[in-house]
């Protein structure tokens, strides 16, 4: 019980932290209110009157019209080329109360931080204590994080479907079909080019499932066919692609604006690396381009591999984590580039002829700030998906964080051999408990690290591929189509 209680204590402490401390010391609130982000305030009607050269008059205006006893005020309009300078202000905590989706943003970020801390403590515990036959509770936390991310992305995508115009709805459906076809094409590529391990994992899953059912006295040819398995994966890929359509398109626009906003060469280089980060992740699983040149080089006389396959798998995990940290560090530049759209819209308005109502002008400026958390969610949700999918890949896939150690066995290997021993040791105490332990041990052999390694490698690669595809399309759209 002492071994099991360590993870339970960590979970209970973190749950208490989420409930008691995080509402007062929120990392999500710090990201927005640390003083590094400035938003543009919309002008008041009196300021617009003064700039337009109109004096505020008391009483009824001559332009007021009376219909059926009701007084109708015609909205005031001002010239579009008015000399308007927007005032900026640092985002304060009180300003976040008016932001749309701020509770969702705060919950996702703070819960992700808590889940990541639990994961780090649990990994340290497993490396030091090396418990056998114990479930890693950080897996549950990571799965909850992914569930919250999918819920929020679904909510944001559903918002586009509720719009009356319908352009966003058509774009989302189009990309969903595109990603479905793309996923079907990717799933037929042999593992000589894309080494996810799906084929090996599915074969191991089918054989173990048949053997498990036979041990239970049931006859079966397998739980699922390979075609059905890949069709389900393709449908999930289409759903993920639809959810990541608008985050990728928005990232492209913020990337272009952030490059214009920052003149520092180092910052611009980091912005370029951040934009190309999904492509780097995608190439890490393309065997002829990366892995073959490192683990089986063809140049030189000796053909000595630079590293083993296990070391390469570990290095791949570290590269993804570093790119996720870079994306989080570049978040402030992207959000500030988005907030500058208010000033950009006013400058564009000044180039146009005609008049605009004061209400429309105020809405145009205020809308940018009020939807800041929507943009922040579109930026950070894919990052959280990549991060915790990678963490699950390490834990459930049986990888290691140690690059130089090729002989160390992952903790999951010890777990696979322990359930039967635990069940046998308790057979004298309770026959029912023994049978349950054997059944759970059989399920662990069915859902083996090979299966999780293939699935999670594929989904990690797919999330990165969707992000790069949509952001590349957004870059082409904003750079060329909008300019034309």
UniProtKB/Swiss-Prot annotation:
It is found in: Cell membrane. GO terms for biological process: regulation of cardiac muscle cell action potential; regulation of cardiac muscle contraction by calcium ion signaling; regulation of heart rate. One of its GO terms (cellular component) is plasma membrane. Keywords: Cell membrane, Glycoprotein, Membrane, Transmembrane, Transmembrane helix. Belongs to the TMEM161 family. It comes from Danio rerio. The lineage of its organism: Eukaryota, Metazoa, Chordata, Craniata, Vertebrata. Disruption phenotype: Mutants display highly specific cardiac arrhythmia and die by 15 days post-fertilization (dpf). Exhibit skipped ventricular beats, irregular beats and slower heart rate but their hearts are morphologically indistinguishable from wild-type counterparts. Increased potassium and calcium currents observed in isolated cardiomyocytes. This is Transmembrane protein 161B. The keyword Coiled coil does not apply. The chain crosses the membrane at residues 108-128, 137-157, 170-190, 229-249, 266-286, 368-388, 456-476. Glycans are attached at residues 136, 204.
């Amino acid at each position: 019980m002492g071994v099991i209680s360590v993870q339970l204590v960590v979970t209970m402490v973190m749950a208490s932290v989420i409930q008691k401390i995080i509402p007062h010391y929120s990392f999500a609130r710090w990201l927005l209110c640390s003083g590094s982000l400035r938003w543009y305030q919309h002008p008041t009607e009196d300021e617009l009157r003064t700039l337009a050269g109109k004096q505020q008059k008391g009483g009824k205006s001559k332009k007021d019209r009376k219909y059926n006893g009701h007084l109708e005020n015609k909205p005031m309009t001002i010239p579009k080329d008015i000399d308007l300078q927007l005032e900026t202000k640092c985002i304060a905590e009180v300003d976040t109360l008016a932001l749309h989706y701020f509770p969702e943003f705060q919950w996702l970020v703070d819960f992700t931080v808590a889940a990541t801390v639990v994961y780090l403590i649990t990994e340290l515990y497993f490396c030091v204590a090396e418990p056998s036959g114990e479930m890693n509770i950080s897996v549950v936390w990571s799965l909850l994080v992914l569930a919250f991310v999918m819920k929020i992305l679904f909510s944001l995508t559903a918002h586009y479907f509720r719009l009356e115009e319908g352009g966003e709805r058509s774009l989302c459906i189009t990309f969903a079909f595109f990603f479905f076809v793309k996923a079907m094409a990717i799933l037929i590529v042999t593992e000589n080019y894309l080494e996810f391990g799906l084929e090996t994992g599915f074969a191991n899953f089918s054989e173990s499932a048949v053997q498990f059912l036979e041990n239970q006295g049931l006859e079966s040819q397998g739980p699922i066919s390979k075609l059905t398995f890949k069709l389900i994966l393709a449908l999930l890929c289409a759903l993920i692609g639809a959810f990541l359509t608008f985050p990728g398109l928005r990232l492209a626009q913020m990337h272009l604006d952030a490059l214009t906003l920052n003149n520092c060469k180092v910052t611009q280089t980091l912005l370029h690396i951040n934009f190309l980060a999904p492509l780097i992740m995608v190439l890490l699983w393309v065997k002829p381009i990366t892995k073959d040149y490192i683990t089986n080089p063809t140049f030189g006389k000796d053909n000595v591999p630079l590293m083993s396959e296990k070391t390469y798998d570990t290095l791949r995990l570290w590269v993804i984590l570093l790119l996720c940290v870079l994306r989080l560090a570049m978040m402030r530049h992207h959000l500030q580039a988005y907030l500058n759209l208010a000033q950009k819209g006013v400058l564009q308005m000044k180039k146009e002829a005609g008049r605009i109502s004061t209400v429309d002008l105020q809405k145009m400026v205020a809308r940018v700030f009020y939807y800041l958390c929507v943009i922040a969610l579109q930026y950070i949700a894919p990052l959280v998906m990549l991060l915790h999918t990678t963490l699950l890949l390490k834990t459930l896939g049986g990888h290691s964080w140690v690059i130089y150690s090729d002989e160390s066995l992952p903790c999951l290997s010890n777990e696979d051999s322990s359930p039967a021993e635990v069940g046998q040791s308790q057979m004298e105490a309770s026959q029912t408990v023994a049978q349950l332990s054997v059944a759970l041990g059989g399920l662990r052999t069915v859902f083996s690290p090979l299966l999780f390694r293939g699935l999670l490698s594929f989904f990690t690669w797919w999330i990165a591929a969707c992000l790069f595809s949509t952001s590349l399309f957004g870059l082409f759209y904003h750079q060329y189509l909008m300019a034309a």
